[in-house]
Amino acid sequence: MAASTQCFLHQYHALRSSPARTSSVSSPKPNQLICRAQKQDDASNAAVSRRLALTLLIGTAAIGSKVSPADAAYGEAANVFGKPKENTDFLPYNGDGFKLQVPAKWNPSKEVEYPGQVLRYEDNFDSTSNLIVAVTPTDKKSITDYGSPEEFLSKVDYLLGKQAYFGKTDSEGGFESGAVATRNLLEASSATVGGKEYYYLSVLTRTADGDEGGKHQLITATVNDGKLYICKAQAGDKRWFKGAKKFVENAATSFSIA
């Protein structure tokens, strides 16, 4: 900038030395104005350069970081920084000789319903939705020693609840005369996991006074080291179709010998 100013001053002195153009010599003020304008342009260019550099820096950072979209559902935290999501619907539970996935919003309960019960969790808002684990001694070497899955169910039918009323009655809802409870085996299967045989049973039970339209009860059973392990998870029929199915099925099918 100093060199440019010197150039204008040099031209000014040259004009003064010419006698023919003495009257046309202009005031040195325009030189000062020109210098000021050049200073303003330099400052403006510097500001633009800074803004451009900052824009390029931000753009490069955005391209370099692979940020996932914040695809949060209602009631969930947005995935703003693109971190991998974790399954927060279930929590791992490691018991004495067994393990399973427990619904995260279910609470432990001290209520004991069945022989050998060592664990019980239930829904915070509806205790009908719950799971239990029972461990009892057995002389069987494998779950298959109980017979077929259907035969095994007949030996542990106490898990489904028994009819307490045996008087004469005719209940609505398709019940037989004198019956106030019924059950239907929806599915029975077996599988080998880790060298152990497992039975899986899905049962729908109904009672004449039930306000849930029945209960879906899922049972997983196996034998290990002289012990019969049973996991039963259940939910009322209405809640089953409103989202409880996922929690009951996952809890029952995740059960295994540790």
Swiss-Prot record:
Induction: By light. Residues 1-73 form a transit peptide. One of its GO terms (cellular component) is chloroplast thylakoid membrane. Pfam families: PsbP. InterPro entries: Mog1/PsbP_a/b/a-sand, PsbP_C. The keyword Cell inner membrane does not apply. GO terms for biological process: photosynthesis. One of its GO terms (molecular function) is calcium ion binding. It is found in: Plastid, Chloroplast thylakoid membrane. Keywords: Chloroplast, Membrane, Photosynthesis, Photosystem II, Plastid, Thylakoid, Transit peptide. May be involved in the regulation of photosystem II. Belongs to the PsbP family. This is Oxygen-evolving enhancer protein 2, chloroplastic.
